[in-house]
A protein has these predicted regions:
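N-terminal secretory signal peptides that target proteins for export/translocation
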Residues: 1-2
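Bacterial N-terminal signal peptides
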Residues: 5-14
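Residue-level detector of intrinsically disordered, flexible termini
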Residues: 7, 20-21
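N-terminal signal peptide c-region/cleavage motif recognized by signal peptidases
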Residues: 16-18
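A generic "folded-domain core" signal
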Residues: 21-175
Length: 175
């Protein structure tokens, strides 16, 4: 159920990324940008960050970013997703780490339409826990394995994420 619910929001969030020109950020906070699209029941608000470091450096990848989204019309808050810039391996077990805490993700490998480059948190309880850790931490490290077998590591600065989340909460308040 969680995977189905999260994928339902994939199309709306996936179309807006730091690398795409279709949507412009409404605000910037340190290393994070905030985006708002739609209105009423279809309003989407999210913050996005891009990695400061990616390894291996020679890996061929598309856009890479991490998103925290609120979709009040669907009752979604703090949905964390990552676009890795390549199709994940079907056996990849991606995870994020902030400090000593790790958070398991699942991939969209079995889904068509480009979802094979996306990952979402395994459990709903981890969404708010990860966002809280991001507010307190300095860096988030995300690891995943490509369909070609390349393990990648992306390091995201968390500078500005607390202010970005405050703005996100104000732009898309809980119902």
């Amino acid at each position: 159920m969680l995977k189905t619910t999260i994928f339902a929001g994939f199309l709306g969030v996936s179309l807006v990324s730091p690398g795409f020109a279709a949507t412009q950020p409404v605000a910037e906070y340190g290393d994070w940008r905030m985006f708002v699209s739609g209105a009423g029941q279809s309003k989407n608000c999210y913050i996005a960050g891009e990695p400061k470091r990616s390894m291996p450096k020679n890996a061929r990848r598309g856009d890479v970013f991490l998103i925290v989204a609120h979709r009040p019309g669907q009752g979604v808050r703090n949905e964390v997703s990552v676009r890795i810039g390549y199709p994940f391996s079907a056996t990849s077990e991606p995870f994020a780490r902030v400090g000593s805490d790790e958070y398991a993700f699942f991939t969209g490998v079995q889904v068509e339409n480009g979802a094979d480059e996306w990952a979402w948190l395994e459990t709903l309880d981890d969404q708010s826990r990860l966002v809280t850790a991001m507010k307190r931490g300095n860096e988030l490290v995300f690891k995943g394995t490509s369909a070609r077998g390349t393990l990648t590591t992306d390091s995201y600065s968390l500078k500005g994420v607390t202010a970005a989340m405050k703005s996100l909460d104000a732009a898309c308040p809980a119902p």
